Amino acid sequence: MAVNSKYHHSCINCGGLNTDERNERGLPCEVCLPEDSPSDIYRALLERKTLKEYRFYHEFWNEYEDFRSFFKKKFGKDLTGYQRLWAKRIVQGKSFTMVAPTGVGKTTFGMMTALWLARKGKKSALVFPTVTLVKQTLERLQKLADEKVKIFGFYSSMKKEEKEKFEKSFEEDDYHILVFSTQFVSKNREKLSQKRFDFVFVDDVDAVLKASRNIDTLLMMVGIPEEIIRKAFSTIKQGKIYERPKNLKPGILVVSSATAKPRGIRPLLFRDLLNFTVGRLVSVARNITHVRISSRSKEKLVELLEIFRDGILIFAQTEEEGKELYEYLKRFKFNVGETWSEFEKNFEDFKVGKINILIGVQAYYGKLTRGVDLPERIKYVIFWGTPSMRFSLELDKAPRFVLARVLKEMGLIKAQENPDVEELRKIAKEHLTQKEFVEKVKEMFRGVVVKDEDLELIIPDVYTYIQASGRSSRILNGVLVKGVSVIFEEDEEIFESLKTRLLLIAEEEIIEEAEANWKELVHEVEESRRRSERELTDTSRSLLIIVESPTKAETLSRFLGRASSRKERNIIVHEAVTGEGVILFTATRGHVYDLVTKGGIHGVEEENGKFVPVYNSLKRCRDCGYQFTEDRDECPVCSSKNIDDKTETLRALREISLEADEILVATDPDVEGEKISWDVTQYLLPSTRSLRRIEMHEITRYGFKKARESVRFVDFNLVKAQIVRRVQDRWIGFELSGKLQKRFGRSNLSAGRVQSTVLGWIVEREEEYKKSEKDFTLLVLENGVNLEVEGKIADDVVTVVELQEAEEEKNPLPPYTTSSALSEISQKLRLGVQEVMDILQDLFEKGFITYHRTDSTRISLEGQNVARTYLRKIGKEDIFMGRSWSTEGAHEAIRPVKPIDARELEEMIEEGLIADLTKKHLRVYELIFNRFLASQSAAVKVKKQIVTVDVDGKRMGIEQIVEILRDGWNLFVPLTVSPRFEHRTYKIKEKKFYKKHTVPLFTQASIVEEMKKRGIGRPSTYAKIVEVLFRRGYVYEDKYKRVRPTRFGVMVYSYLKERYEKYVTEETTRRLEEIMDKVERGEEDYQATLRLLYEEIKSLMEEG
């Protein structure tokens, strides 16, 4: 259901102008193909002699289906989900890393690709790490191949005549497929570099990467000249990216995923010359139940081992503890092995079932922690104590991150200073005793454990825990098998600290022993492995997720275990492997299209009585930042040719979309996000049909999972609402801006309904402010109370004439919406509203808060549970009072997504668990967190006084809280408690006379409040409107952070009010906002609304 728009560069055949209606139906533009419903688009274009780019898509799908049927015929099975993705890349001629778990057919795919290419007369080389694999592959290939396919292999133990046969065919290029070992690549570098292969498959990239010169050899084997490799390497050494010559068309290089991280910079040659990085399988797909047992009881351990019986790893904190456990369990006749003296032998015995239990030591790089991938055997992981990092707190030995944090907090070093550890220790000794230092650490590092007697800081090693527990749950034959992790931990502080970090990093929770049903868990563990052994239908799929922001794509891919990244034209694509297959993440980097500026009515054509918006790709000058839509090679402002054109982004998305089985557009959950979603969807529909929309309200694993459960198509009411807003902005903005520019002779001036209305408030408030100056006196009473009284007070006493006391329950404020967040955070932290909005955007995209553009105060049950969990953690569950606040609103209020406070986040930044958060981010997060927790806490019971006093013959009322009777939400948002009054006369200790304006000037915060109150603007535009007023020079901020109009701003507003008042009145602006809201809800026809807008500004246009 298209929305009657035209898009430049969207025709799938000529790349020209097409309608969204034709794109939705998969049709090229009318110039290429006037027909409305051809039975065969390719043939119709061919017959009209207008066939262009559509040939590529037609041939792509034909080639892919040919590969698929060939594979099925030869191998007897259809492609798996992983293999479908790889096949589509092969057909497109792309090099890549095969990132996938074991048992999904990587080697089979490499062989079948070589055989398929051989049919086309193309040459392939298959490289394996061992002679055994070379032999096995040769045998399999010869069984599968047709007689005409020439296959030769080489290994050292071959017969003499076979070697000679290989060498002859190799020298004469008389072969289709060659199979040899990594060692052969190293020894025959010169010969191989002279050959040109269409396809090179490397089965064990780790073995190849051991000798960095092998990388050059592989690149030359696919046709990249040595001179280009040298140039590329030289560029990479300078920290730059090498741009491969456009005329260079190399063959395809496919490598298996690495197990170790590639070292050095030479592997970056793959990135710059073949557009892929050597990825590692870092699957975070896990299905683990974590259980905590709150005592280190060996009897309990024995009881548990008798339930589990087999497939058990035990991690002790030290080798001594491990030996003690080993000897203890031997006494109970358990079949147990250790890993500190005979790792290889005992591990092999464990592998084949001769040993049931294996004991190792907790260590991040330990062999048992990282070097083991045996999900068929490892089912249960037991930790004898929490994996921890221990740091001395002696002033001579304390670690740098602890010293720096303490000294910065005390103001002894500046935030930007970076002294070395010895200098830090020296400063600490000069200003702190050992006892004071430990007390400071306790006060500041709340989420860790400080042992006074040992002067030791203990931080749970969450990454070691995640790595080691993950041995029990992996993808096995396409099935994510179940695992159980048990932690024996007595120390409550250490356990809570681990629990918090596990929730942040892996989004996994730990249950207590009482909640665990061991019998049921054992059944789930065994059943998942039985399922992996059965002959199952392959359910793996490839999925492409398109978001707006590269940060969001990066955050999501990291949560799901990013395995590799690559560049596709001008965008980055991240790849992750999950239990259901491969997920690709990429970003549009904001809007991809905008209204053209020339033609029609400011970019909107009128056809058959209907308005048709015309869009072109957005272009942005990388040098000066100017944005435009015209098709031109240089910036219209600074003439730079360094242009970022979203046409490239769209083309890249079309190419990537061909790889995936399913595409989900996950742009922001608002009207702007919906419009971007439609812009992308209509562009991709001609080349792929499996395309839907999801909304993510938080960037977490949970948020992603929940969004996947509510897949839908684009909401056209939201798209239409965005079009109406944009067209209204364009029409009124262009017309009024043109009048201003002409009147004042300045080309950078702008006007708009909301912008000009708000400017009017500021101008008028300035006038009211100037007229409102009055005398005031500040009285400081002997009981410590300050009273502000209008007028000049002569008396030296204040008499209490009436006094009442009452108990009252005070309820909390609701959680933040966009307007209340911008207003309060801007005010409290003295930040501009645009800066606050940018910080909120960062916190959302990095997965710390829910979506930040919202008018709703609603809190979901999941949100309420975040509050309950945190209150339980700090021992305050008794004050939990779950409130939904509202049942309305597509979004929730702004809230934290995890029960982790700002102090804990700060500690995790110091530990390196979190990156890219500044002090400002933490302060904003703290305000959001506290406001949210307050909103979910019980009412505060207070005692208040209602007092009437006589001052200079005038009576004034005072109401104040004098006592907190029962704590509640005030633990997060403190209340002011004032000194009590008694029924008597109080001396005035001090008087201060001053003049004060009774009408306050606006601040950025109060402008946003006013916009919300008067129904002007929207959550997504509040900050932007304020920012535009500053940028245009209409307003400025004085030293008290008050917003005031410039002389020029007053002139602009006076001119608009005098000449064009009806277009910029508050009433007109509010009425239009209401109409646009109705379009969003589907209650108003959007074409009729555009007609109404047009008729309203027609006279303005005709004025000239």
Swiss-Prot record:
One record GO biological process: DNA topological change
Residues that hold ATP according to the record: 83, 100-107
Localization of this protein: Cytoplasm
Gene3D superfamilies: 2.60.510.20, 3.30.56.80, 3.40.50.140, P-loop containing nucleotide triphosphate hydrolases (3.40.50.300), Topoisomerase I, domain 2 (1.10.460.10), Topoisomerase I, domain 4 (1.10.290.10)
Catalyzed reaction equations: ATP + H2O = ADP + phosphate + H(+)
Zinc finger (RG C-terminal-type): 618-645
Active site: 851 (o-(5'-phospho-dna)-tyrosine intermediate)
Family of the protein in this entry: In the N-terminal section; belongs to the DEAD box helicase family. DDVD subfamily.
Assembly, per entry: Monomer.
Descriptive protein name: Reverse gyrase
Taxonomic path: Bacteria, Thermotogati, Thermotogota, Thermotogae, Thermotogales
